């Protein structure tokens, strides 16, 4: 653990300063004895020597620092709050802040800052820890070798946790040179520093531990590089480093997890599962020593792989197994202290990173949403959003749960086709007075609040509006200029962690503008193009929800904003025109609505491919084909430009009806019907045909359309009706007539 070497280095620093200050031999001997006792794990003797030092020199705060670290280790690293409080007091006593470190004179306080950075790391305050670590890195040259390595390893870990991969890779190159140079100096007899490996038995679990042998340090560097390349999806570079990891670490659980993650990115899902199953997680140290529940990570990674394969039910099973393992691990930890001053005490400091419950809840919610169980997904995601409330993507997923829960889920809709059931609600009366009651098509817009506040987390359209408003507010207000690439709707994300912690805020001072992102924990951060795609998705959902709630002005406003987006996919552009037209019709602006319903507005209905996926495919560098992803998500309706233009024509006909332009409406209806198969005609179009025939006085033809539940060509049917009685009672069964396709009828 990083604090381990901090304690050793603190004592060594005190000894070095004693030599410079000309203090007595007694103080030197006590300092040396304290260091030896600490290294040997004899913390009682170490504290005794430090107490004697404090009696001699009461003004040296380094003695107090070393005593605090020794007390921390004596308690088996369970007094985190006390150590944090002592460090804060010492910082106030020396009147020094991290921002004030501007010269080498402040290097003497480096041990204090480093220990604070380690505590911030375990408290998941990553940005604060990075701020301290970067200040220390500026003065790394005068540091001793072991301490310099510790600072670099800690910073690398923090950069990876905050997705600053370029900084992490740069620092790894520097660290590699430092280790090679130090090894060369040792071989030449230039380094006479005493090196103890007594505390290196927990190498992999220790964060930022620089006092390790060269081979172990090289292996650790290779593992960090693999994690960085996996984040960058640079598969060629990752493949080279994976070989180095396997050569240096063998078939250890961390190396096999990393290789499995690599195969997962390549699309070799079966191989990824095989690698996970071959890892002997039973031999890996327990979470009490490392802070990492390997069993939890094992099941979580299996869930992610099966999610990518399209096996969502199996993926959900594995995520629930991971959640069960996580809860079992947390149950073994002492309950949280009610005293705010001892919130993090009573448990080893490394176990502060053990609980991954909310990441797993997020994964379960996404899986359930894909399965088609929005209400169950809502329950999981509502709990996750209490922690990850700054994630705009998560708020969108919550809104999608609400929309799906309040939307019809007929069998035809799930297959991507419109429903044609429910045109006739009932039949009333008898004989001459027999009437057909048509079902209302606007039932889905009748929402009830039941007097409850819309802020209460319930899967309602009112709560969906709040979620979407939050998502829009969390996205950057200013449009970011980007390269001219084809955008796409943001896809659902799951977390695939091998030894990861919780994501946090990230630095914005990146070297390349294209790499700017906003955090979206627990999933990966949103890159520039993903932000634009997500904004388009949110605007489309807001317009839909506003229409459902009857807020037509809000719907029109957001639909127009959607159409103004520079990187708009074809499918969302189609929806934008439809939502804008519906809002305008409700506002009695039919002429403006007709402009939006022009079929020529639809030229593409694809969801698009994100740049990240394109880069991943181009960087594959392999001749072997990727595995099939299993059961794919069905294409949303409409699945083609023809279907989309047909939908536009049906709606355009409805708009013409509102202006009593029935001839134009009939032309739109017949033109649309000739473009698609009769079974794909939506029920709204059939009702429109019934309305037009009633307006034209063709009652019998309207009845025939209702009975057959399909459109009928007017000319053919009128000629048939002249040869048959004009009226048939509704209770008599009618023999089905095989009707020709619309194209054939029109040719005749």
Swiss-Prot record:
| SMART domains from the UniProt entry | TPR
A GO cellular-component term linked to this record:
CCR4-NOT complex
Which controlled-vocabulary keywords does the entry list?
Answer: Cytoplasm, Nucleus, RNA-mediated gene silencing, Transcription, Transcription regulation, Translation regulation
Keyword presence, Transcription: yes
Location(s) in or outside the cell: Cytoplasm; Nucleus
What is this protein's function per UniProt? Component of the CCR4-NOT complex which is one of the major cellular mRNA deadenylases and is linked to various cellular processes including bulk mRNA degradation, miRNA-mediated repression, translational repression during translational initiation and general transcription regulation. Additional complex functions may be a consequence of its influence on mRNA expression. Is not required for association of CNOT7 to the CCR4-NOT complex.
The protein's name is CCR4-NOT transcription complex subunit 10-B
Q: Which organism is it from?
A: Xenopus laevis (African clawed frog)
